[in-house]
A protein has these predicted regions:
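C-terminal hydrophobic helical "lid"/dimerization subdomain
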Residues: 1-9, 253-257, 297-356
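Residue-level marker of beta-strand positions
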Residues: 13, 69, 88-89, 103, ...
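Glycine-rich beta-strand-centered segment in the early N-terminal region that forms part
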Residues: 29-43, 56-102, 142-144
Length: 356
């Protein structure tokens, strides 16, 4: 089937249930007014996917259809979509705003009061042969990016947004807590802004070594009793900005402890439960705690630029590509420390010359 043909009948779709992950049959959805039908090519397994599969995600209930990091091809367009045509290679913003609430009208669709999310509790997800989505959430992938690079646009947009909320890090000292895919993507994005120094914390030695290879000035064992002191020593001072990509109680305390007076702690990770804050330190040191939720279109545009310019290279992050039939194995790989970014091959490459 070519991208220009209209599919019909049934398709494959991944469903994550308690203690199992299956590929099941489902009807091919039809695009409504203002929507496009996308044929999935590659879908990334996110940390939120593995946490949800383990029953640890606060906002995703089982069973659910996963997949929000995706590169695909427009297969069909609904009425009222003049700007896209079948055959275009695309990625999507998976957040699904109402467009009418106070936050949406302010241009903050990422924190819409009625937000849905493709692949995170929505009836559809990108780990399927096809899915429909609002055409306003679709971004055309430039020809310079191969499919693997395009699959990183969505996850890279999360740290790009966090950097924006921190008012950038040029000339500032930075601590990044966590060296998973988001923490390491954040490292590369931060380095592009010219920080004074960047230190990464991670419990596993191989992740600390990887952070150093990707440009960190130092890497500290997150489990060390004196981790906060080590970060300060490596920075030469307390951190102007701390990005917590783990969001556990331990990292929250570390982040506040290593932040400079008047500094900023950006919460990038998704906490799995309630966390107690050392609020007396926050007040006394005038520390700003800044939440960071997904991203906006300008962050997607910046992510595309970071990838096209080579600041972020897919070869540094994509460690496995698994066929759709091996989705359970892909989730196991993504949850293991041996892998950074695991992709699921839903279909053949969008363009064989750009398969990556």
């Amino acid at each position: 089937m070519t991208a220009q043909q209209t599919p019909s009948g049934t398709m494959r779709q991944v469903v994550v249930s308690a203690e199992r992950i299956d590929v099941v049959g489902a009807d091919v959805p039809r695009p409504g007014v203002g929507e496009v039908l996308v044929r999935s090519v590659l879908a990334g397994v996110c940390g939120s996917d593995t946490h949800a599969a383990a029953g640890l995600h606060p906002w995703i209930s089982l069973p659910y259809v996963p997949g929000h990091e995706v590169v695909g091809v427009v297969s069909e367009v609904g009425a009222g979509v003049p700007s896209l045509e079948p055959g275009r290679r695309v990625t999507v913003e998976p957040s699904l705003p109402c467009w009418n609430c106070k936050q949406c009208l302010r241009g903050q669709q990422n924190i819409c009061e009625n937000l849905g999310f493709l692949g995170c509790g929505d009836p559809q997800g990108a780990m399927a042969d096809y899915f429909t989505v609002d055409a306003r959430r679709v971004h055309v992938v430039p020809d310079e990016l191969d499919d693997r690079a395009a699959a990183l646009i969505e996850p890279l947009s999360t740290p790009v947004h966090a950097l924006r909320l921190a008012d950038g890090v040029s000339g500032r000292t930075v601590a990044i807590l966590g060296a998973g895919s988001i923490g390491l993507l954040l490292l590369r994005a931060a380095l592009s802004q010219g920080p004074k120094r960047v230190v990464v914390t991670a419990p596993r030695a191989e992740r600390r070594e990887l952070a150093l290879a990707l440009g960190a000035d130092a890497a500290v064992d997150a489990y060390a009793d004196d981790a906060v002191e080590q970060v300060r020593a490596a920075l030469g001072e307390s951190a102007d900005v701390v990005f917590d990509c783990v969001a556990s109680e331990a990292t929250t305390r570390q982040a506040i402890g290593m932040a400079d007076k008047g500094g900023t702690v950006v919460v990038v990770g998704v906490p799995s439960g309630e966390i107690q804050l050392p609020l007396q330190l926050v007040q006394d040191r005038q520390i700003r705690i800044q939440g960071s939720a997904t991203y906006l279109p300008e962050d997607v545009a910046d992510s595309i630029e970071l990838l096209t310019s080579g600041v972020v290279r897919p070869g540094d992050f994509v460690t496995s590509v698994v066929p759709m039939e091996g989705v359970a194995e892909a989730f196991e790989q993504a949850a293991s420390p041996q892998h950074i970014k695991v992709l699921i091959a839903i279909d053949g490459p969008a363009d064989p010359d750009r398969a990556g």
